[in-house]
């Protein structure tokens, strides 16, 4: 009898913990973690469909746009990185060789498109 009442008490405690967690999850506002346009590419479309955090289903279905606070990054904050300059790269490598005598450089062979070639 004691075992049965302990088992029932354990089940009730587990169910109430799940219920509390579910109620708290409903109170978290749904936010878009990644703001991408689905038409940009198929990969972006997958992310746009998938990355929604409401914590009832974590990675759940996309909610209506009326529910979501969409954050747009202004163009002024986006900084484009210039391509690497060979002189700057050579200076960096020489500096590293000076600081670390055992520094070694590894050069991967590439094709004209700039892709790394593993097998030639």
Swiss-Prot record:
Localization annotation: Secreted
Superkingdom assignment: Eukaryota
GO CC term (a single one): extracellular region
Region called PID14 protease inhibitor domain, residue ranges: 46-59
Signal peptide segment: 1-25
Mutant lacking the gene: phenotype: Keeps the ability to penetrate maize epidermis and to grow intracellularly at sites of infection but fails to spread and induce tumors in infected leaves.
Post-translational modification, as annotated: Cleaved by host target papain-like cysteine proteases (PLCPs) to release the embedded inhibitor peptide PID14.
Major location (coarse): secreted
Reported induction: Expression is highly up-regulated during all stages of pathogenic development. Expression is positively regulated by the unfolded protein response (UPR) signaling via the binding of CIB1 to the UPRE motif localized at the PIT1/PIT2 promoter.
Keywords, in A-Z order: Secreted, Signal
Function: Secreted effector required for virulence. Functions as an inhibitor of a set of apoplastic maize papain-like cysteine proteases (PLCPs) including CP1A, CP1B, XCP2 and CP2, whose activity is directly linked with salicylic-acid-associated plant defenses. Acts as a substrate mimicking molecule for apoplastic PLCPs and its processing releases the embedded inhibitor peptide PID14, which in turn blocks PLCPs to modulate host immunity.
Quaternary structure note: Interacts with host cysteine proteases CP1A, CP1B, XCP2 and CP2.
Domain remark in the UniProt entry: The PID14 protease inhibitor domain is sufficient for inhibition of host cysteine proteases.
Protein name listed in UniProt: Secreted effector PIT2
Source organism of the structure: Mycosarcoma maydis
């Amino acid at each position: 009898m004691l075992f049965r009442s302990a088992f029932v008490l354990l089940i009730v405690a587990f169910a109430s913990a799940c219920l509390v967690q579910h109620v708290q999850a409903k109170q978290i506002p749904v936010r878009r973690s990644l703001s991408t346009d689905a038409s940009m590419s198929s990969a972006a479309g997958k992310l746009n469909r998938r990355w929604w955090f409401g914590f009832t289903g974590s990675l759940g279905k996309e909610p209506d746009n009326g529910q979501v606070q969409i954050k747009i990054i202004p163009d002024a904050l986006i900084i484009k990185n210039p391509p690497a300059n060979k002189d700057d790269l050579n200076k960096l490598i020489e500096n590293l060789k000076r600081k670390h005598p055992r520094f070694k450089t590894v050069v991967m062979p590439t094709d004209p498109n700039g892709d790394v070639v593993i097998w030639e």
